[in-house]
């Protein structure tokens, strides 16, 4: 099901000037993987994998800080297709069961 995707990049907290940029697109989430416990905002890195309406792959990476949500840091990576995304994020895509 296609819906609006909005991902952000930068640091969240007041001392880090909020988020530096964001990306909005139409698409669907095709995978998720985390190496920690991001739901509790205490540690780890989470990856959301999206496919846009145009077929592009967006990987949204969020590193959750150990102590405060003000230090959470996000980044997004946009690729033309799944093969291109796999060159940089092969392990993430495997663990998210996308490839």
Could you tell me what each predicted segment is?
Residues 3-5, 49, 57-59:
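Terminal, low-complexity, charged helical segments
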Residues 17-18, 42-47, 72:
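Short, surface-exposed coil-to-beta transition loops
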Residues 26-56:
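Amphipathic, interaction-prone secondary-structure segments
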Residues 16, 37, 41, 60-63, ...:
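Histidine (H) residue identity feature
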Residues 2-38:
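Negatively charged, low-complexity tracts enriched in Asp/Glu with abundant Ser/Thr
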Residues 11-12, 34, 51-55, 61-67:
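Short, flexible beta-strand-to-coil junctions
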Residues 63-99:
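Mixed-charge, Lys/Arg-enriched low-complexity segments
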């Amino acid at each position: 099901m296609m819906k609006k995707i909005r991902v952000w990049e930068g640091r969240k907290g007041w001392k880090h000037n909020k988020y530096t940029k964001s990306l909005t697109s139409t698409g669907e989430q095709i995978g998720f993987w985390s190496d920690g416990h991001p739901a509790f905002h205490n540690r780890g890195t989470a990856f959301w994998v999206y496919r846009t309406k145009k077929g592009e792959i967006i990987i949204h990476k969020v590193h959750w800080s150990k102590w405060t949500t003000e230090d959470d840091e996000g980044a997004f990576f946009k690729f033309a297709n799944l093969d291109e995304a796999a060159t940089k994020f092969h392990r993430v895509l495997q663990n998210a069961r996308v490839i």
